[in-house]
């Protein structure tokens, strides 16, 4: 029987990585927040890989942190190994990655929600969204509890009509054998929301005692640990190694012989899977010229023997999986603790959302994470944070937070989903960001902390720390521009020793650093008045000095980009009235409802000629008004 159970400003449905960030942001900005999860023991569950960060994903975590989110702080408290990736490449693609203690990561996030003053945490299944006159009114749970609310954030992950597939065995389930949410999908369909099926998968978990590490290459953590969160100066930890091995000829033979039993190839799987995280059987079919594939053996925590077999997700039958895993060097006697599986789930076409992550046709209803068609913990957390922030800003009658593509990877992520849409689980990559030299992970705080402070998520002590770092970097840049280095004998000897050329005339230290063989760290012996700076401040100064030319070019590109971004399109515009617009362009523009010319220009099916017609129309209307 239905009963009135309470009133909240914001209700968050789901307590995965998106839901946790959404609820914490909402509560910390002063809104009374209910977060519902089907299992209190699966909060911030790492249902797949036991790590946070990685290429482009590390950028997202740093940005979440700079805006006042929790993911970076949580992994700093619960990591078991840390590595900076892509250090042989330029700073734009340097990405931090940390192995997590999965259980501790989840437990700490749960405890944060339990302690947060404005959060009410409940184990409940929401089965219905109540909407009147295109505005949310409340949610109904399976046990009859009805909660009124001003905003609802859907963070359902892979639970909506979840279906696990292992060979020809198919059953209704959420991830890791958890209960699926089978009723909510119908409520969303009744509201006119378009749903579709996506698929993801996870590899087996094996027992550490059954692994022969002597046949693998050890992958230790970095000696110098770099924190994810800008609030942490240094971290110290006894780290646990990962290991690298490869598939064998026998692995490929087993898969080829049993490919007819793969749900991917016999029609059992309807959902579309992630292009950039294919199953092992998909890799072997798609890349027949490769005789081996990398397999990473990753620990799942300090107090467990479970190991994650990275790079080997599968939906093959269990009997095939056992043979397949045991054909990998070092895994000849592997004991499987959890079978690999594929999972299908309902999600939305994100083009139904606007750039605040609110549904265009339902006031107060937001989506975040895998529900929006993305993949990955970090992508989910970023969307959850933005949805939580915007729900509160709307309730308070304030302007929304809309991050541009030139502001953050989060801006690229949301713009791609909402403007371009996605026909497969969307994964963030550095190649998706046009201005990646400006959107480095090292400067996320310098880019976004001001925004986080203005909206009330970044507190005073954190803000003061940011101001101090900003001032130190700016002051040091100014100082080294004034320090003159002359061609003295001992200086030229030093330069020759470093593989550089002699000085013929005085040069500033700032210009000297630009030489390919030198950097801010190497020229320290020439700089006796150098102030005491932190490692991250020194790194920031080095990047700004060495890459100044490239950075300035991208800044010029951003100025051009902003001209289109600042040309706002009136909400009242009727595209059908615009003569010269192609029918496809009219349909796409009416569907997406872009807020500015920049967004309109990125819609698939809208040509540069259509944009010219639209601009001429807007100019004429402006003159008439």
Curated annotation (Swiss-Prot):
Gene Ontology BP term (one): tRNA methylation
Quaternary organization: Homodimer. Heterotetramer of two MnmE and two MnmG subunits.
SUPFAM superfamilies: FAD/NAD(P)-binding domain
Predominant cellular place of this UniProt entry's protein: cytoplasm
Subcellular location: Cytoplasm
Family under the similarity heading: Belongs to the MnmG family.
GO function terms (MF aspect): flavin adenine dinucleotide binding
Protein name: tRNA uridine 5-carboxymethylaminomethyl modification enzyme MnmG
Keywords noted in UniProt: Cytoplasm, FAD, Flavoprotein, NAD, tRNA processing
Binding-site residues for NAD(+), renumbered to this chain: 273-287
PROSITE patterns, per database record: GIDA_1 (PS01280), GIDA_2 (PS01281)
Residue numbers binding FAD: 14-19
Function of the protein: NAD-binding protein involved in the addition of a carboxymethylaminomethyl (cmnm) group at the wobble position (U34) of certain tRNAs, forming tRNA-cmnm(5)s(2)U34.
Pfam families assigned to the protein according to its UniProt record, in alphabetical order: GIDA, GIDA_C_1st, SAM_GIDA_C
Cofactor(s) recorded in Swiss-Prot or TrEMBL: FAD
């Amino acid at each position: 029987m239905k009963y009135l159970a309470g009133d909240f400003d914001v209700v968050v449905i789901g307590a995965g990585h998106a839901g946790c960030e959404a609820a914490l942001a909402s509560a910390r900005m002063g809104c009374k927040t209910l977060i519902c999860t089907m299992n209190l023991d699966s909060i911030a569950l790492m249902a797949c890989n036991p790590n946070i960060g990685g290429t482009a994903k590390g950028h997202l975590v740093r940005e979440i942190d700079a805006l006042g989110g929790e993911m970076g702080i949580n992994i700093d408290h619960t990591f078991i190994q840390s590595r900076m990736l892509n250090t042989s490449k330029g700073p734009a693609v340097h990405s931090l990655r940390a192995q997590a203690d999965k259980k501790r990561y989840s437990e700490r996030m749960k405890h944060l929600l339990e302690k947060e003053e404005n959060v009410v945490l409940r184990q409940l299944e929401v089965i219905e969204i109540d909407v009147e006159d295109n505005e949310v009114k409340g949610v109904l749970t399976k046990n009859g509890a009805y909660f009124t609310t001003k905003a609802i954030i859907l963070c359902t992950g892979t639970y909506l009509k979840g279906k696990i597939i292992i060979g020809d065995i198919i059953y209704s389930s959420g991830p890791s054998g958890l209960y699926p949410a089978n009723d909510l999908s119908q409520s969303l369909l009744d509201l006119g929301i378009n749903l579709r099926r996506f698929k993801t998968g996870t590899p087996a978990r094996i027992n550490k005692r059954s692994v022969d590490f002597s046949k693998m290459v050890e992958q230790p953590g970095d000696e110098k640990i770099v924190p994810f969160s800008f609030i942490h100066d240094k971290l110290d930890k006894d780290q646990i190694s990962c290991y690298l091995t490869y598939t064998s000829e026998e692995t490929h033979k087993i898969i080829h012989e049993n490919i007819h039993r793969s749900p991917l190839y016999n029609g059992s799987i309807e959902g579309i899977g992630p292009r950039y995280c294919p199953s092992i059987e998909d890799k072997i079919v798609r890349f027949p010229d490769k005789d081996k594939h990398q397999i990473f053996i990753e620990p799942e925590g300090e107090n467990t023997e479970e190991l994650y077999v990275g790079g080997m997700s599968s939906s093959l039958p269990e009997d095939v999986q056992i043979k397949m895993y045991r054909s990998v060097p070092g895994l000849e006697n592997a004991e499987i603790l959890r079978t690999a599986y594929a999972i299908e789930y309902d999600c939305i076409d994100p083009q139904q959302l606007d750039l605040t992550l609110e549904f265009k046709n339902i006031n107060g209803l937001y989506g975040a994470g895998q529900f929006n068609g993305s993949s990955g913990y970090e992508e989910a957390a970023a969307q959850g944070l933005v949805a939580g922030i915007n729900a509160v800003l709307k309730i308070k009658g304030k302007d929304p937070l809309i991050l541009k593509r030139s502001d953050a990877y989060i801006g690229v992520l949301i713009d791609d989903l909402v403007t371009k849409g996605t026909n497969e689980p969307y994964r963030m990559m550095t190649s998706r960001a046009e201005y990646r030299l400006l959107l480095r992970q090292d400067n996320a705080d310098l880019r976004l902390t001001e925004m986080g402070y203005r909206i009330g998520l970044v507190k005073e002590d954190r803000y003061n720390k940011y101001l101090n770092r900003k001032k130190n970097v700016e002051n040091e840049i100014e100082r080294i521009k004034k320090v003159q280095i002359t061609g003295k004998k001992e200086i030229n000897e030093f330069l020759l020793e470093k593989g550089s050329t002699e000085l013929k005339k005085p040069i500033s230290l700032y210009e000297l650093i630009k030489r390919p063989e030198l950097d801010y760290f190497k020229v320290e012996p020439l700089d006796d008045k150098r102030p005491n700076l932190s490692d991250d401040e020194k790194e920031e100064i080095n990047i700004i000095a060495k890459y100044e030319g490239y950075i300035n070019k991208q800044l010029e590109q951003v100025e051009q980009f902003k001209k289109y971004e600042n040309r706002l399109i009136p909400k009242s515009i009727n595209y059908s009235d615009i003569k010269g617009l192609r029918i496809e362009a009219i349909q796409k523009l009416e569907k997406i409802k872009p807020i500015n010319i920049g967004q309109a220009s990125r819609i698939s099916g809208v040509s540069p000629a259509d944009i010219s017609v639209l601009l001429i129309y807007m100019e004429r209307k402006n003159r008439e008004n």
